[in-house]
């Protein structure tokens, strides 16, 4: 059987990994310098200033939503959100009956501008959290549509490329073998 011996590392190895070690000195900040290391010495990219931010590329191209479409999408999303909250509320309640709160929200959904409505004029239609949820959902839907369009375009391009490959291969075979009949041997 093989026999092996191991030795315990000396304290010098631990000294190499300490902050005072020359191996770590290059990226460690000096006592009088700022806490972030210099990008030239440590190979990290400097963060961009707020004024120097590059604009994000437009994903939709010419497919921008009009304000009417945005409003319609927000209204649809809000009704989905309210239905979801109703279903969650109904699910959490016992099966025996429905509370007055859900009935009141149902009546406010059907007729929000009725005189008996509990919604005040000064009260905003959406809370900040609801607007955030709506925007996230709209962005997700828009991203999904863009992904679908992108996949369709890629599939079309791939099909065109395949067609040209098949045509090229067929032309090469015809040049090489001419009008001779194809055989299993060749």
Swiss-Prot record:
Residue ranges under compositional bias (Low complexity)? 49-60
Listed under GO biological process in this entry are:
positive regulation of myoblast differentiation; positive regulation of transcription by RNA polymerase II
| Chain span(s) of sequence motif Nuclear localization signal | 22-27
Which domain of life, per UniProt? Eukaryota
* Coiled-coil stretches: none
| Function noted in UniProt | Molecular adapter that acts as a bridge between proteins, and which is involved skeletal muscle development. Functions as a signal transducer for MSTN during skeletal muscle regeneration and myogenesis.
Q: What is this protein called?
A: Akirin-1
